[in-house]
Amino acid sequence: MADSKMKLHCGFIWGNSAALFCINEKGLDFELVFVDWLAGEAKTKTFLSTLNPFGEVPVLEDGDLKLFEPKAITRYLAEQYKDVGTNLLPDDPKKRAIMSMWMEVDSNQFLPIASTLIKELIINPYQGLATDDTAVQENKEKLSEVLNIYETRLGESPYLAGESFSLADLHHLAPIDYLLNTDEEELKNLIYSRPNVAAWVEKMKMRPAWLKTVVMKNHIVDLMKQRRLPIKLDSSCHESTVVAQKNAIAIENK
C-alpha cells in the first residue's frame, strides 16, 4: 500500500469527527495520526512549531498545505475535491450562501452551547473534574431554544441549506452525536421530541460515511484509553482498510 500524502492529525474532540466525516464523504485515502489532546500532545514544541501554533486539533496536511480549524479543513476538502465523492457544496450561489449562513449559526449559536455540555458531561468526568450542574441546566435551556429554530427550518427543507446534505449539516452531527452519547436522557429528549430535528439527525447518522467515522472515532478513543496497538476493526468498517503503526493509522477508502 502506497503512503498517502494526506494526513489528518486528530484526537478526541468533536471537530475531529467533522473532519473525518468530510474525508469519508469524499472517499479519500489518508493517514490518521492520533494526537492525545487531553494529555497535552498538541502543546509540544514540535507540534506548535510545525502544525498548529494554537495547539489544537484537527490539523490536515495535504501535500505542502497545512490547515487547522475544522471548518477551514472541510471547506478546503469540499472545494478541492468537489468532483470526488459526495458534493458538499450547493452549486447555486444563493443556496451556498444559505449553507454558509447555517455554518455560522453552528459556530455562533449551536456549538458554544453543545461544547459546554460536552465539556461538563464528558470531558470533565474523564479528567476527574467536577461537573458544573448549573452550567449544564442553563445550557440545556439554551439548547431547547436553539433547537426550536432548527425545528422550524427543517420543516421547510430536509437539510439546512435545502434539499441536499451539505457542510452545514455535516458540522452539526459530530457534537450532536456526543450529546446523544451522554447519560442525560433530557438531552436526548430535546433532540428526539422535535420530529423534524429527529428525522434530520437520523438521516445523517445512517450515512455510510458517518458509520465509518464512528468506527474510526471509537478506535481513537481506544488509543486514548489504552495507548497500544495494533487496532482491529470490526465489520461495520468493512469498506475501509486500516493499518496501524505507533499512533498513525493509514485509511484506504474503497
Curated annotation (Swiss-Prot):
InterPro entries for this protein: Glutathione-S-Trfase_C-like, Glutathione-S-Trfase_C_sf, Glutathione_S-Trfase, Glutathione_S-Trfase_N, GST_C, GST_Phi_C, Thioredoxin-like_sf
Entry's Gene Ontology cellular component terms: cytoplasm; cytosol
Main location: cytoplasm
Record PANTHER family: GLUTATHIONE S-TRANSFERASE F14, GLUTATHIONE S-TRANSFERASE RHO
Enzyme class, broadest EC rank: transferase
Function statement: May be involved in the conjugation of reduced glutathione to a wide number of exogenous and endogenous hydrophobic electrophiles and have a detoxification role against certain herbicides.
UniProt entry keywords in alphabetical sequence: Cytoplasm, Detoxification, Transferase
Domain (GST N-terminal) ranges: 4-85
Family (UniProt): Belongs to the GST superfamily. Phi family.
Species assigned in the record: Arabidopsis thaliana (Mouse-ear cress)
Subcellular location, record wording: Cytoplasm, Cytosol
EC number assigned by the record: 2.5.1.18
Underlying gene: GSTF14
A GO biological process held by the record: toxin catabolic process
Keyword Transferase among UniProt keywords: yes
UniProt name for this protein: Glutathione S-transferase F14
Gene3D superfamilies: 1.20.1050.10, Glutaredoxin
GO molecular function, one term: glutathione transferase activity
Catalytic activity: RX + glutathione = an S-substituted glutathione + a halide anion + H(+)
Domain GST C-terminal stretches: 92-231
Binding site for glutathione: A42, K43, E56, V57, E69, P70
Pfam families in the cross-refs: GST_C (PF00043), GST_N (PF02798)
